[in-house]
Amino acid sequence: MVVEKRNPIPVKEAIQRIVNQQSTMPAITVALEKSLNHILAEDIVATYDIPRFDKSPYDGFAIRSVDSQGASGQNRIEFKVIDHIGAGSVSDKLVGDHEAVRIMTGAQIPNGADAVVMFEQTIELEDTFTIRKPFSKNENISLKGEETTTGDVVLKKGQVINPGAIAVLATYGYAEVKVIKQPSVAVIATGSELLDVNDVLEDGKIRNSNGPMIRALAEKLGLEVGIYKTQQDDLDSGIQVVKEAMEKHDIVITTGGVSVGDFDYLPEIYKAVKAEVLFNKVAMRPGSVTTVAFADGKYLFGLSGNPSACFTGFELFVKPAVKHMCGALEVFPQIIKATLMEDFTKANPFTRFIRAKATLTSAGATVVPSGFNKSGAVVAIAHANCMVMLPGGSRGFKAGHTVDIILTESDAAEEELLL
């Protein structure tokens, strides 16, 4: 087999090549209660003002502000209570001179009133109360349309539907929501050295950990996942299973078979399915041999067979592709600053990603590597909630240095590619 020539490209360029492809999933309609974490397929426009009417944000008394002028501790002013309303009720009384309506939180302000006195600001008697301070017009009132007015875009196309967005959709009567269909993912682990999780260990063999990990990462994104039988290092069967997966799924992820060894067939498989290789080497560690191809609107990700490299490839490349396919406004990894809490002395000829544990406090973020950090390591992934990103050309970092980290357990993303 001829060894394929590979020229590494920067991580940022690799991500950009992925999202430059034209691949958008269709819009579908789902029930409101099923819409969580989907991407909106259209703008949601306010069809009425919020609040719909002037209302009270407190329990208290609705009064005319003019009647409170001159009130003080030495000159308490008395009001007569003429009605009592709760949320959902509307008073039919017109508030007159030194009159008041007892009002509960959320109730509509009665005609004539333009201020609300909270109960704790009064001394109550049987059907009267007194106050000791003046109130201004619209004091303690939530005004009609102060949050949003008719015609405002309240949710944007491409926005992730979170619990707050569901509240907005329910407010405007959306029992069904138009969203972008989420892509389905095929996961194919390759390698004659792999055993299934229930198999007895043999000399020279290891259990397949990448397949279950990638499945979990994809399902965490809410994606439908198809798991394919572990593939031996055989070109013909590899071509067949990738073709089958492409017929049924929008994304095909293979693990292993991307290096330059005698039994790494992925480049030949991509040729056989007529896929355009976007890149086949990235200037990073681990996962430099990560390969991504594109065919018929579908992504084919060739992730490393080494667990840490496989995990890194999913976080950096698969996640943005999924968000891009769903038309998300925010696609790219979110990067924050953190203080490194222990030395990392290894030189970094290329951008290095370290599985790590971040702690966020009021004083800022700190981070420490989560364990053994070679590309084949697996335990460190289980204890990580982020990846430290060390720039290429650096010669190690000391405790106390500020570093960039990507929060892998966070759903947050950026509109701009900051890597």
Swiss-Prot record:
GO terms for biological process: Mo-molybdopterin cofactor biosynthetic process. The gene is moeA. Its cofactor is Mg(2+). Pfam families: MoCF_biosynth, MoeA_C, MoeA_N. Pathway: Cofactor biosynthesis; molybdopterin biosynthesis. It catalyses: adenylyl-molybdopterin + molybdate = Mo-molybdopterin + AMP + H(+). This is Molybdopterin molybdenumtransferase. GO terms for molecular function: metal ion binding; molybdopterin molybdotransferase activity. Catalyzes the insertion of molybdate into adenylated molybdopterin with the concomitant release of AMP. Keywords: Magnesium, Metal-binding, Molybdenum, Molybdenum cofactor biosynthesis, Transferase. It comes from Staphylococcus aureus (strain MRSA252).
